[in-house]
């Protein structure tokens, strides 16, 4: 069942993306952020949930949920990133295309 949530997010299910953004597992939040960005999801509900994750420092493989959130907000044109964090810069540069 858990993998099906990620599959639903990948397939563009908005409800699954919202569920992923609210999920207790960092991998689900990170996937939801990445798929939101890839799919250009910029509706108010999703953007507000991504903004709330800018301070979420849980993560995997050296990247945090906040890295993903900050990069996504830049990619979506919501908040331009001007910092120096290399993880965030790499995510912005690749635009989450590794998830496609």
What are these model-predicted stretches?
Residues 1-9, 26-41, 60-79:
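Structural detector for internal amphipathic alpha-helices that build alpha-solenoid repeat scaffolds
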Residues 7-21, 40-56, 78-87:
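Amphipathic alpha-helical scaffolding segments comprising HEAT/armadillo-like alpha-solenoid repeats
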Residues 24-25, 57-62, 93-96:
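Short inter-helical turns and helix N-cap capping residues of alpha-solenoid HEAT/ARM repeat scaffolds
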Residues 70-100:
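Eukaryotic acidic, Ser/Thr-rich intrinsically disordered low-complexity regions
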